[in-house]
């Protein structure tokens, strides 16, 4: 079993508990001889900047799969629109005081501060005809289309890179990484990961956060899989 590329989440996976980049994970990624793609719920310009500063090739999945690009100098491709998300936001705003995060730069979803009752909001949304879901990444709550996720983003980006999604190993920690694990050929959850992502993972590390990412990569190398 040999994989051709790696796709890895940022926050909670290649960071420390305080959200600083884990230098050991950064160094480990830079030693690999396969393409490394960053996948995040954050905005495209953030993902691109992180890729560049880490020293990777610029291929990223952003906005939970809603935005992808293969290089720094190639325009991002966006899937879906904000129209349905805005309708859901307007509806929920009648019940909660909501604060948008990075609204100027988000093109395919709405990210909210985590200061309202998520389960109550989900129950309220079920009464409406929106094809929308609320996803908690532990750093923000995202109003997003049910037709967009990191797995779909990986399939799109893999094709743009000349690969299949199954050619990738995926590493992550949050519930929004689950579809990416299912699309990839192999999924590794770090120890601090959500139960949802651990359930679909092929391997769960003993270490957490960036230490877990290092452990994951070393596990793959020791088996000759990358």
Swiss-Prot record:
Substrate binds at residue 150. Pfam families: Hydrolase_3 (PF08282). Keywords: Carbohydrate metabolism, Hydrolase, Magnesium, Metal-binding. The keyword Magnesium applies. InterPro entries: HAD-like_sf, HAD-SF_hydro_IIB, HAD_sf, PGPase. Its cofactor is Mg(2+). Its EC number is 3.1.3.18. It catalyses: 2-phosphoglycolate + H2O = glycolate + phosphate. The keyword Hydrolase applies. One of its GO terms (cellular component) is cytosol. One of its GO terms (molecular function) is phosphoglycolate phosphatase activity. The active site is at 9 (nucleophile). Mg(2+) binds at residues 9, 11, 173, 177. Catalyzes the dephosphorylation of 2-phosphoglycolate. Belongs to the archaeal SPP-like hydrolase family. This is Phosphoglycolate phosphatase. It comes from Methanosarcina mazei (strain ATCC BAA-159 / DSM 3647 / Goe1 / Go1 / JCM 11833 / OCM 88).
């Amino acid at each position: 079993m040999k994989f051709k590329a790696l796709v890895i989440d940022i926050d909670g996976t290649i960071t420390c508990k305080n959200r600083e980049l884990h230098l050991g994970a950064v160094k480990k990624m830079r030693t690999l001889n396969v393409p490394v793609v960053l996948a995040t719920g954050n905005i495209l310009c953030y993902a691109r900047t992180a890729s560049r500063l880490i020293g990777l090739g610029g291929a990223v999945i952003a906005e939970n799969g809603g935005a992808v690009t293969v290089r720094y100098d190639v325009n991002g491709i966006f899937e879906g629109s904000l129209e349905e998300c805005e309708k859901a936001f307007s509806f929920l705003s009648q019940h909660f005081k909501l604060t948008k995060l990075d609204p100027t730069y988000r093109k395919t979803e709405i990210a909210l501060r985590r200061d309202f009752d998520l389960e109550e909001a989900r129950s309220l949304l079920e009464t409406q005809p929106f094809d929308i879901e609320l996803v908690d990444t532990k750093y923000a709550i995202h109003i997003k289309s049910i037709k967009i996720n990191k797995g779909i983003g990986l399939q799109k980006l893999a094709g743009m890179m000349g690969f299949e999604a199954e050619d990738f190993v995926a590493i992550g920690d949050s519930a929004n990484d689950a579809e990416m694990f299912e699309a990839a050929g192999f999924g590794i959850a770090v120890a601090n990961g959500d139960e949802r992502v651990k359930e679909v993972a092929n391997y769960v590390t003993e270490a957490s956060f960036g230490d877990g990412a290092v452990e994951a990569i070393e596990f793959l190398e020791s088996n000759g899989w990358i």
